[in-house]
């Protein structure tokens, strides 16, 4: 579960919030994710279609030659408890079937719904921070928190 990297401040952005890009430090955070995601053999890259989320996962996607899976249900505008739970449940089922790692990149206001769907307390991730969730038979057995660099 990935919170997008550091983006430009809302207060200084004049356009559509979905188009708000990463700051330079956020772009560095995105590149720093490449070896971390590779260590977990992440192959499914699900993300909010907001530019800041896309830019967070693009360096890794390009490294492994994978496409980003755009998930409207995890945008700030569209997220509901039911929709997010359905997305998370689908990812967990896919992980159980494929045995391949996945990442879900989203926004601070959506993260509590993601963690609730996993049966976890919201750890209040900082920009660029992630929680690796280890599953066994579809149940959470351990978590690891990775701070941004």
What are these regions (language model features)?
Residues 82-90:
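Helix-loop module immediately N-terminal to the HCX5R catalytic loop
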